Amino acid sequence: MPELPEVETVRKGLERLVVNQEIASITIKVPKMVKTDLNDFMISLPGKTIQQVLRRGKYLLFDFGEMVMVSHLRMEGKYLLFPNKVPDNKHFHLYFKLTNGSTLVYQDVRKFGTFELVRKSSLKDYFTQKKLGPEPTADTFQFEPFSKGLANSKKPIKPLLLDQRLVAGLGNIYVDEVLWAAKIHPQRLANQLTESETSLLHKEIIRILTLGIEKGGSTIRTYKNALGEDGTMQKYLQVYGKTGQPCPRCGCLIKKIKVGGRGTHYCPRCQCL
């Protein structure tokens, strides 16, 4: 699943490709992917111009002025822009024909991606209802609320970080990475972390997600940005996907276990339970 660095990289590519472009028509091959009123979706966007492409957590926000199209890539979603003819592909599900003759296509092998049309004035309430936490930046991701959230939870730390309430944008890859960096076992109960562990974890979340954005995200399986390029963050991962390889810090072999139903990579020596 694309996580925050990957989605931000897609956003940057879309910003270059489609901002200030007007929608001429829309074709939807898989109607179930549109989670708001389908007819409203079909008639509201043609004639509108993409003013900005923004991001909140793992959500892409196409700003059309009064309305915003909220897009979630889920497991395999990606956007492609074709300047002329669009090739046949059974995994192309939404087509946004632009007035300049090009077509923005949404591709999704799993068909898990979602689209919603939301009034811009309702966007804050939309994300409040989803209980989406702050962006992982030094300005918005404050230590005190994060520390309090951990102290009040009896959940293991990994599932808690994955649920997006304390901080937005973390997925399986980057949770493994930040927990390794902070030397915290993924099964540790959140309310058992010390203040120093919580402080280090907070700093590493900001540092690693920022690095992920700088490196264009991680291409592990199929991820590419909107320009068709691979990310390079996979070259900087320390534990994710490294089962049986030496820990870069201590040399102990990396192990993989299940935590909350998710495959989880950690160092048994650095991250004691």
From Swiss-Prot:
Organism of origin: Streptococcus agalactiae serotype V (strain ATCC BAA-611 / 2603 V/R)
Residues that hold DNA according to the record: H91, R110
Zinc fingers (FPG-type), renumbered ranges: 238-272
EC number: 3.2.2.23, 4.2.99.18
Catalytic activity entry: Hydrolysis of DNA containing ring-opened 7-methylguanine residues, releasing 2,6-diamino-4-hydroxy-5-(N-methyl)formamidopyrimidine; 2'-deoxyribonucleotide-(2'-deoxyribose 5'-phosphate)-2'-deoxyribonucleotide-DNA = a 3'-end 2'-deoxyribonucleotide-(2,3-dehydro-2,3-deoxyribose 5'-phosphate)-DNA + a 5'-end 5'-phospho-2'-deoxyribonucleoside-DNA + H(+)
Alphabetical GO biological process terms: base-excision repair
Note accompanying the cofactor annotation: Binds 1 zinc ion per subunit.
Family: Belongs to the FPG family.
InterPro entries: DNA_glyclase/AP_lyase_DNA-bd, DNA_glyclase_Znf_dom_DNA_BS, Formamido-pyr_DNA_Glyclase, FPG_cat, MutM-like_N-ter, Ribosomal_uS13-like_H2TH, Znf_DNA_glyclase/AP_lyase, Znf_FPG/IleRS
Alphabetically ordered keywords of this record: DNA damage, DNA repair, DNA-binding, Glycosidase, Hydrolase, Lyase, Metal-binding, Multifunctional enzyme, Zinc, Zinc-finger
UniProt cross-references to Pfam families, sorted A to Z: Fapy_DNA_glyco, H2TH, zf-FPG_IleRS
PANTHER family: FORMAMIDOPYRIMIDINE-DNA GLYCOSYLASE
Any GO molecular function: damaged DNA binding
PROSITE patterns recorded: FPG_CAT, ZF_FPG_1, ZF_FPG_2
Active-site residues from the entry: P2 (schiff-base intermediate with dna), E3 (proton donor), K58 (proton donor), R262 (proton donor)
Function: Involved in base excision repair of DNA damaged by oxidation or by mutagenic agents. Acts as a DNA glycosylase that recognizes and removes damaged bases. Has a preference for oxidized purines, such as 7,8-dihydro-8-oxoguanine (8-oxoG). Has AP (apurinic/apyrimidinic) lyase activity and introduces nicks in the DNA strand. Cleaves the DNA backbone by beta-delta elimination to generate a single-strand break at the site of the removed base with both 3'- and 5'-phosphates.
Protein name: Formamidopyrimidine-DNA glycosylase
Subunit field text: Monomer.
Cofactor: Zn(2+)
